[in-house]
Amino acid sequence: MKKVAYISNFYAIPPLKGAAVQTWTNEVAKRLWFYEPHTICVDDEFLPLKEYRDGVYHHRIRLSKIYKRIFQKILGWDVYSYNDRVFNEVKKINPDIVHFQNYHNGIESLARKIKTWNKDIKVILHLHNFYDFKNKNFDKLDAVITCSDFLMKNFEYLPNAKFYKVIKNGVDVDKFKKINFKKDEKIIIGFIGRIVSQKNVEYMIELAREFKNLPEYNFKIIGEIIKRKDNYEYYKSLVKKVKEYNLNNIEFLDNISPDKVHAAYNDFDFTIIPLNDKESFCMVGIEAMSCESFVIARASEGSKEYMVDNENCKLFDFDNFAKKVKEYILNLKYPERHRIISNARKMCEENFSWDKIAEDIQKFYKEVLNDTSK
């Protein structure tokens, strides 16, 4: 059986907190029928360095705090870098395909190193976000994958490769589904995502302000509160607004683990998704839709590939967003609501199940492996 090695950075696999790229990797890897899947990623204190789980071999790389402090921060000499350690794992696995998940520093050199060691390994770069590749030299890629047509068409300085393919994100439709329970009589309007300015969380605060005098509505913001300076200042600005508006109908709930996030969507009667223009897909959208939480969004071009206004969601521009959303929610009748969330669920089942995404990627692997051109 041929082997695939998925290489990632930033979060462990499987992810213990919201991480769309690592979720994609884990969900697809454990559904591969025709390939032996391996992941190479950073470590997590709650996970072993080596693990076989759900049919996937996980290889986690630990860089100690002492190493990071002395060699990376003080000396600035990464003598045995993350990429060096990844390369050693690749040599041990000896895969047929190396599948890089998103870009991290030095991938272009690492790809070159892998190809020099074994020219028969197929190297794939899978992009989920925009990056500045103007001065990057990717000369050893066999394929480039993007998560949306929008990203493929609008990625400036897209690396040269023999194959280009769009493969969408997915959702576990068996897990992310409507659970027939009702927690209380209040109508919950929710947001899920990192608490950073790129996620436009301030629109949730403004929406909560619009509903201030309607006690049957509550607002929940679920997402990682990042302590880095700029991000934390943004979070504090949101808290300041809540106090300034004297809001008692909104709460911040810190990050929840991926295996519980489907329950959060089931708690939400409405999921608010105020996307920026650069959002390449938006996994939150299909997760909410799969759970039949009514999606109200400001859509990006990437998310418009599946978000269809008045068909499976409701879309608004940022101009007067909160006022327009309030008016829409207050006037939404059950038949229309039911039609839209049913359409959304059906779309997820037909187009975005992880089984379908895994089937698509395996077909593409076969195409890449069968290529014998130089």
Segments from the language model and where they lie:
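Short hydrophobic beta-strand element within catalytic cores of glycosyltransferases
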Residues: F294-A297
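Conserved acidic donor-binding segment of nucleotide-sugar-dependent glycosyltransferases
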Residues: D309-N320, E327-Y334
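Glycosyltransferase donor-sugar binding loop
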Residues: N218-K236
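N-terminal strand-loop element at the rim of the active site
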Residues: S8-I13, R31-I74, K227
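Nucleotide-activated donor-binding/catalytic signature segment of Leloir-type glycosyltransferases, i.e.
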Residues: K115-T116, Y232-I256
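Short alpha-helical donor nucleotide-sugar binding micro-motif in glycosyltransferases
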Residues: N255, A264-F268
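Conserved donor-binding/catalytic core segment of Leloir-type glycosyltransferases
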Residues: K182-K199, I205-R209, K220
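Carbohydrate-associated surface elements
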Residues: F150, G170
